[in-house]
């Protein structure tokens, strides 16, 4: 892996990419992990069909594994949707498939039995590991090349994990590979049979915020340490900084407020006529931020965004609260709710309800605050950082007396303030 990254560098190719506004993003190329053996007979997933079931179930119960290493395009219509993002009843059907797989394994010789047909796992899971359109390739766990009886190219004993994006550094890729090897070794020894969680709307609410992804991923590392694999959280700190970049910080009245990037699923729009064909656009006009507050007195202080109170949720640590902000950042010609205008810049106020005034605040702009339009992409990380810093100010809070509205927490997304509803 390090050789490939170095060879790309020597060929004047870069593994880093920056958007016009300076955001650090993936290069667009897939970093799909392909697992298998030298021959189909050596594939661990054909020798132990329960191993794939363990991986799928563990990924399902730990959404951080799906979202920490993925690209910008996530959600039901992405290139690698989770099983429970495809259809509402897929988790129920997946449990039936796991039970049937185990029944067939027990009938044909038990775990590791030589009498288990190699095509068995393909037939049982093929119609579960799909996207909303039934595409078997566009799935988080792609088994097209595992052992499909349809043709020789499908009988290679290979499992493709598509929920990985190329990281900017070789060692970030290496630690991903190490994580996969450790999980496979763990489940080879002890199959994962825990009941599948019904995440519901929580999947696209709580687990799109970096704080809760970090908590869930810490549980994963804890499981690996109990199994004898000494993983340290610091090894994955670059991944969290890459996926949930720091936007800015504010300190006022003994309270610390941190704004970070968050994940946002992109929706595919309905069909429209294109140049000689039919096209379906992707709505990337909505963005999401995470606001984390430390030292807050929930009886006294309220955090508002454009005058709307945030539905802050406790993290389990005293005085620490987190919430997400979802807002229309860009005006696209094809988007959900096209009549809703751009809601940027965001003004985040830390309000003292006892005095009725803001202790301080900050502003976040999605583009240059002076209205300048960048014509070229950043040439390096320094220029990209300067563009990011130019869009956040620790000034500009709402002056004068403030009347805070009554907090209306969403029933479907209690961790998120969706400004499109206001």
Annotate each language-model stretch with its function:
Residues 1-27, 38-422:
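C-terminal accessory/tail domains of diverse enzymes
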Residues 30-35:
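A short beta-strand motif that forms the metal-chelation/ATP-contact edge
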């Amino acid at each position: 892996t390090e050789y490939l990254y170095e060879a790309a560098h020597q060929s004047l190719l870069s593994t880093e990419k920056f958007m016009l506004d300076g955001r650090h993003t993936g290069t667009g190329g897939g970093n799909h992990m392909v697992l298998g053996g030298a021959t189909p007979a050596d594939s661990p997933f054909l020798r132990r069909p329960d191993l794939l079931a363990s991986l799928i179930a563990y990924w399902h119960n730990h959404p951080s594994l799906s979202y920490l290493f993925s690209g910008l395009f996530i959600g039901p219509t992405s290139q690698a949707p989770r099983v429970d993002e495809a259809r509402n009843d897929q988790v129920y059907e997946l449990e039936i498939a796991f039970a049937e797989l185990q029944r067939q394994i027990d009938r044909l010789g038990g775990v590791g039995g030589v009498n288990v047909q190699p095509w068995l796992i393909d037939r049982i899971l093929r119609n579960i590991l799909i996207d909303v359109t039934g595409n078997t390739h566009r799935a988080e766990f792609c088994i097209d090349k595992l052992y499909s009886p349809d043709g020789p190219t499908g009988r290679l004993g290979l499992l493709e994990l598509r929920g990985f994006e190329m990281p900017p550094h070789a060692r970030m890729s290496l630690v991903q590979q190490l994580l996969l090897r450790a999980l496979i070794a763990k489940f080879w020894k002890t199959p994962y049979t825990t009941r599948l969680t019904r995440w519901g709307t929580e999947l696209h609410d709580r687990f799109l915020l970096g704080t809760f992804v970090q908590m869930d991923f810490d549980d994963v590392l804890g499981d690996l340490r109990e199994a004898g694999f000494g993983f340290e959280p610091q090894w994955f700190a670059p991944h969290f900084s890459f996926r949930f970049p720091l936007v800015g910080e504010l300190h006022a009245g003994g309270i610390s407020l941190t704004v970070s990037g968050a994940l946002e699923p992109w929706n595919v729009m309905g069909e429209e006529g294109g140049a000689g064909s039919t096209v379906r656009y992707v709505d990337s006009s909505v963005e999401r931020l995470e606001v984390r507050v430390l030292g807050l007195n929930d009886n006294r202080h309220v955090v508002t965004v454009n005058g709307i109170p945030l539905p802050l949720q406790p993290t389990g640590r005293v005085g620490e609260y987190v919430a997400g902000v979802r807002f229309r950042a860009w005006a696209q010609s094809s988007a959900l709710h096209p009549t809703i205008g751009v809601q940027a810049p965001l003004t985040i106020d830390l309000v003292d309800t006892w005095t009725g005034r803001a202790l301080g605040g900050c502003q976040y702009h999605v583009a240059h605050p002076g209205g300048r339009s960048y014509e070229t992409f950043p040439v390096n990380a320094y220029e990209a950082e300067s563009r990011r810093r130019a869009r956040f100010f620790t000034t500009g809070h709402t002056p004068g007396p403030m009347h805070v509205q009554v907090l209306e927490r969403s029933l479907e997304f209690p961790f998120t303030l969706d400004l499109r509803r206001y």
